[in-house]
Amino acid sequence: MVEIEELRRLPSPGPKPQAIAFDGERLWIGSRETSRMYAIDPQSWNAHDEGVAPGVPWGATVVGDELRVILGEGEEDIRVIRRFVPGHGFKTDGAIVAPDNGTGSHLSFDGDRLYISQWYNKRILSLDEKGNVGSIIALPHEIAGHTIVDGKFYCITTDDENTHEYFLTRVDARSGGAPKIDDIARLHFDARGLAFDGERFWTNHREAHETVAFARPDA
């Protein structure tokens, strides 16, 4: 299995970066330590603080002109998916409690349905606008981030979060049958979250307070 080709490694705008998404122009990063959202120009790396979240931002994805951010709220860290409007912040309407009593950590959107991944349950679930679960895709590894590229899921995965062995796993579930799952590259750091800007992937090396861009290995 090939190693990822790192293209850039940059200081994150906030400590312990966790959530990450790309809206076509800007990267969006959520800090687990400060619970703040940041918008970043990926070329200049200039960042703008977009304000505090009503919880810990674990994962994010772009839905039209908005974001959906999954937050850990309250002492029990219940996961709630909330609307985030750039320039206006988080909205109270349209909130969805994550499935299985508030379980999940990362999000993606295929233009029609929202998807949520569950780390320890090793699966990706599709959700409708009310949070009802549709399809369920089981993976062989724990999931530390995912995004959708060309109709396929690309996931950051691991078999043991206490090691530094992580994988980029490609999941093609479009046939309607058993998904085709391939580990296509290896990462030697504790990656969190995954986004794609049309050319390269972005993830967070959370404990190093860095954001990393790497080449798409199957391009």
Predicted regions span which residues?
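Blade-level signature of beta-propeller repeat domains, shared across WD40, Kelch, NHL, RCC1
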Residues: 190-219
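Conserved beta-strand positions in repeat-built beta-propeller and related beta-rich domains
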Residues: 29-34, 69-77, 116-121, 155-163, ...
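A short beta-strand motif characteristic of beta-propeller blades
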Residues: 5-11, 45-51, 90-98, 132-137, ...
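Short loop/turn segments that connect beta-strands within the blades of beta-propeller domains
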Residues: 23-24, 33, 63, 77, ...
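Beta-rich, blade/repeat-based domains predominating
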Residues: 11-24, 54-63, 70-72, 98-111, ...
